[in-house]
Amino acid sequence: MKKISLPKIGIRPVIDGRRMGVRESLEEQTMNMAKATAALITEKIRHACGAQVECVIADTCIAGMAESAACEEKFSSQNVGVTITVTPCWCYGSETIDMDPMRPKAIWGFNGTERPGAVYLAAALAAHSQKGIPAFSIYGHDVQDADDTSIPADVEEKLLRFARAGLAVASMKGKSYLSVGGVSMGIAGSIVDHNFFESWLGMKVQAVDMTELRRRIDQKIYDEAELEMALAWADKNFRYGEDQNASQYKRNEAQNRAVLKESLLMAMCIRDMMQGNKTLADKGLVEESLGYNAIAAGFQGQRHWTDQYPNGDTAEALLNSSFDWNGIREPFVVATENDSLNGVAMLFGHQLTGTAQIFADVRTYWSPEAVERVTGQALSGLAEHGIIHLINSGSAALDGACKQRDSEGKPTMKPHWEISQQEADACLAATEWCPAIHEYFRGGGYSSRFLTEGGVPFTMTRVNIIKGLGPVLQIAEGWSVELPKAMHDQLDARTNSTWPTTWFAPRLTGKGPFTDVYSVMANWGANHGVLTIGHVGADFITLAAMLRIPVCMHNVEEAKIYRPSAWAAHGMDIEGQDYRACQNYGPLYKR
């Protein structure tokens, strides 16, 4: 199978075209800006798969229509999906801009006094606004000398934020969401909206009945040698939790072994359906070997599958993690209960950070008063204003135990290329595999159980679709919280102690949906949410603006909000601007 190439970032150095001294005096400085931008991005950003980002610089500086067209021809042949235009001087606005309406674009105008880079920036942005092709503005806060080749910190922040979000847009385009099954228990997110994927994300939806998974398992449409490797790996690494089922529902050793085998097979077959597997072609199964070009997937499970077959918890947990029997690798994005909208939030988070994502129910708001009444203990520290219990039936990425460590030795979740084998082993050691509760899952299964370490910064997100409006994005930055063991045990037992738990405390602003923790819970738009490592809400906001998805709820500092310059023309209130601009421009891939 031919590997689909990764999108690249195109750098467009633009210049004043007047010869006889003007252009000649600017060539080196302008091209050096392009090279510095490319070097920064190549050094600081990777694709979600871990590959280094490639930047393509125009062959010459661009002064007008001819050189602009030559640049576009080069970019078109090299899979450029994002562009950054750079200049230290005045150039000819609409004659030099990137006119591709589907491609995220930014312009960095050098803040210097010798030549008017800011004037070109303003003129070019005016052209973008007038033509209905939004672009992001980058302009340093402080004046630099003409021979200063450094990139100021504020410029760097915008360049990198734009590049991360732009690459996410380009990476999703042309891929598919694999819907295995249909609607799970009436959950709206599993009513997969093809128009949303096509118009806003540039993706297709591949709908496959769960009987295809059954067929692959029953007819051995998988790598049998890999299954043996997976079973041996599980035997070595799985630590089993208490079977809380009544005696009549407990399975014997042989039955448990069969459940484990099928759970691992589900992971293998869903993965193969997503990305393909050349080993299947070697078995003569060429069609099945191709996969569905899926960058994300969802598995319905409940109840049409789980009432008679093992649930998807083990398969989903392992696929969503950064490691399995094949070692450390890029995590997949697989949504529980085929909640495609939570799957999209997972996809956004993974593309922006390269890390595994925690899929969870936004289950319970615990007020300080309720916690004290139930446990006799008071919440304190980050938890003092109350907490939200994020928990689901064992499908969260195992990275979520936060047994990985950052450069300061603090608990975190890292992109897979930074994870050591010891850290992967620590996440596995922190996880118990509990027999599924029969009342929920009659077909059995194993649910992963872990507790997220406290004090870790997270960003919780969710995409919802509103009739008459379209998709909206919710964002809540906050922290995981570590509770005293006795308190945790009491609260955890009131829900389901066989599932993974993250205690989450959002950062409060005292206003609107962030007035208090209760308000965050009350304003959340669905039963599911996603945790992405770090306070990265600003990156989500930039990405949403590129896709024309308004943000209906966030607690990101206003200074960090970065949207296309044309948003400022849509009113004076920053969030109202977002709604009006998204409505005005419509979805990125209008259908």
UniProtKB/Swiss-Prot annotation:
GO cellular component: cytoplasm
The reaction(s) this protein catalyses: L-fucose = L-fuculose
Protein's GO biological process: D-arabinose catabolic process; L-fucose catabolic process
Active site (record annotation): E337, D361
Co-factor requirement: Mn(2+)
Domain of life per record: Bacteria
UniProt keyword annotation of Protease present: no
Function, in words: Converts the aldose L-fucose into the corresponding ketose L-fuculose.
Residues given in the record as Mn(2+) binding sites: E337, D361, H528
Name of the protein this chain belongs to: L-fucose isomerase
InterPro entries reported in the protein's UniProt record: Fuc/Ara_isomerase_C, Fuc_iso_dom3_sf, Fuc_isomerase_C, Fucose_iso_dom1_sf, Fucose_iso_N1, Fucose_isomerase, Fucose_isomerase_dom2_sf, Fucose_isomerase_N/cen_sf
Gene name of the record: fucI
UniProt keyword terms in alphabetical order: Carbohydrate metabolism, Cytoplasm, Fucose metabolism, Isomerase, Manganese, Metal-binding
Organism for this UniProt entry: Salmonella schwarzengrund (strain CVM19633)
Family per record: Belongs to the L-fucose isomerase family.
EC numbers: 5.3.1.25
An example molecular function term from Gene Ontology annotations: L-fucose isomerase activity
Compartment annotation: Cytoplasm
Pathways per UniProt: Carbohydrate degradation; L-fucose degradation; L-lactaldehyde and glycerone phosphate from L-fucose: step 1/3
Subunit (UniProt): Homohexamer.
